[in-house]
């Protein structure tokens, strides 16, 4: 039986790259996202190589998620790997200058959405057992604070701790859980964070070498295909040209 991967946020960035990486290895694909036209285009690219099932899905709606999982067609029901990739960052300015609605949007997607999809697929993953894998896409922002990270960083800290706690609950089932925490990566993610400001997005990467979506997709595939007795609890990935910075200190003028 062909291995099957369920990818959220598959229409761009890490998710899209992961779809191509897993397809290259012959996996069946369940691809989800909110933009149906992009899902259809991606299916068109891949379906000649592997079986592809697409779902226009808002992960924030638990009823919709449950119904989508319950309705998976034959050939896509035994999900071996879940890539919880859907997520976003908004409002990179200081917390006191943000709109509360942006905070709720990040929480609803990065936390509630991830929980919804995980809960819906846990019975399937447990049934698959040994070698089944959940890859939760976190961020270095979930471990290391920086200005403008506020709710985004906190949501990714949740992803990290949820992954650890889930590992404890799933002990003995054979299901593995990894918090995959990327650093700076040049994807559409940054354009969303800057509110569509292409110049601001480009400026973040100018003069350096960021991670690519394909770099992270390769790590996703590596985690999913490790020997069944091996689990990465957390994998933090930065480009070579990124590191931590000094503490911020408020000095008198």
UniProtKB/Swiss-Prot annotation:
Pfam families (alphabetical): adh_short (PF00106)
Any one GO molecular function term: oxidoreductase activity
pH dependence: Optimum pH is 6.5-9.5.
Pathway(s) it belongs to: Organosulfur degradation
UniProt signal peptide: none
Active site per database record: 152 (proton acceptor)
Binding site for NADP(+): 6-30
Residues annotated as binding substrate: 139
EC number(s) from the headed UniProt entry: 1.1.1.313
Name of protein: Sulfoacetaldehyde reductase
Protein's organism: Chromohalobacter salexigens (strain ATCC BAA-138 / DSM 3043 / CIP 106854 / NCIMB 13768 / 1H11)
């Amino acid at each position: 039986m062909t291995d099957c991967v369920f990818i959220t946020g598959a229409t761009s960035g890490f998710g899209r790259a992961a779809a191509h990486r897993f397809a290259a290895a012959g996996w069946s694909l369940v691809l989800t996202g909110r933009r149906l036209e992009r899902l259809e285009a991606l299916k068109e690219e891949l379906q000649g190589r592997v079986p592809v099932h697409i779902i226009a899905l808002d992960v924030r709606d638990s009823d919709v998620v449950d119904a989508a999982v319950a309705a998976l067609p034959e050939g896509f029901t035994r999900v071996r790997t879940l890539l919880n990739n859907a997520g976003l960052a908004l409002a990179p300015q200081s917390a006191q200058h943000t709109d509360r609605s942006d905070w709720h949007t990040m929480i609803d997607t990065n936390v509630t959405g991830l929980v919804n999809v995980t809960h819906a697929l846990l019975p399937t993953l447990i049934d698959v057992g040994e070698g089944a894998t959940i890859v939760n896409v976190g961020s270095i922002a979930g471990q290391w604070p920086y200005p403008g990270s506020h709710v985004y960083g906190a949501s990714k800290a949740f992803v990290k701790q949820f992954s650890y706690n889930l590992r404890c609950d799933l002990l003995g089932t054979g299901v593995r859980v990894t918090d995959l925490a990327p650093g700076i990566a040049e994807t559409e993610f940054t354009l969303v964070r800057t509110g569509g400001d292409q110049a601001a997005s480009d400026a973040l990467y100018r003069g350096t070498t960021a991670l690519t979506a394909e770099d992270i997709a390769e790590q996703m595939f590596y985690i999913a295909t490790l020997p069944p007795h091996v689990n990465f609890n957390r994998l933090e990935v930065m480009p070579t040209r990124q590191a931590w910075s000094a503490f911020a200190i408020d000095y008198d003028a």
